[in-house]
Amino acid sequence: MKITDIRATTVTVPLEAPLRHANGCHWGRFVRTVVEVETDEGLVGLGEMGGGGESAEAVFRAMKSYLVGHDPARLEEMRFRLANPTASLYNNRTQVLAALEFACLDLLGQKWGVPVHDILGGRLQERVPFAAYLFFRYADPRTGAGEVRTAEQLVAHARELKGRHGFTAHKLKGGVFHPDYELECYRALAGELGGGPARGDSFRFDPNGVWSTEQAIRFGQAVEDVRNDYLEDPTIPNNRWADPGDSRVPAGTGF
């Protein structure tokens, strides 16, 4: 089996309301690039990359000169053609490789009549739980709906998602308001959904590294009684101004 064509299409996924975070806002959509890898046997494998537009599509068109005629089973050779350990540091090559590798694995699964997990070593679980991903949100500028700013709005939104999809874990993206206000909202969320059998649902928080060490410690101590899965990136990575003795978790974990 040989690759005969590579196509890339930008896809925008609409958001029901703008999502707020420490870096600003996702205003109306998520952008992705869907990649199709076609072969001489008529099979088409699908992959995906974050981001998109003219530049992303042009990158995948350029990959045709490297990969047309290539056997999609030769994944390591493809990796060294596109993203060897030196070149992979530049121009998002690892993202491009990941989308193409995914498409090639899809092709191999189709050709061999097996699921991709068998190619990668076998399935370990029958089910994989998903968590709700909660954001503070602006109201949709067109409809005025979807705002999440208060603790009451956050809890109502989390309950809606739980009712619709059955989530038992809930991650809140912070770094938008003062840590004390976000603590109030997070505790309200845990108070509403954290009770019941087996201590109820679990919770996760991520302020995108905008807190000081002191703020992070204060927040962490204030939620020790919550069923936390993790506290993600409370401070900037490799915070040179922090005292290593302030943390009981090694900095190498990134937490």
Where do the PLM segments sit?
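Structured beta-strand/loop patches that form or line metal/cofactor-binding pockets in enzymes
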Residues: 1-46, 50
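Metal- or metallocofactor-binding catalytic centers and their adjacent structured scaffolds
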Residues: 6, 38-112
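Active-site mouth loops of central-metabolism enzymes
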Residues: 90, 129-155, 174-175, 207-212
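Short, charged beta->alpha transition segments
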Residues: 115-120, 154-161
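N-terminal small/glycine-rich loop or linker at the start of catalytic domains
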Residues: 118-147, 185, 198-202
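Catalytic domains of carbohydrate-active enzymes, especially glycoside hydrolases
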Residues: 157-173
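Catalytic core of soluble alpha/beta enzymes
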Residues: 174-255
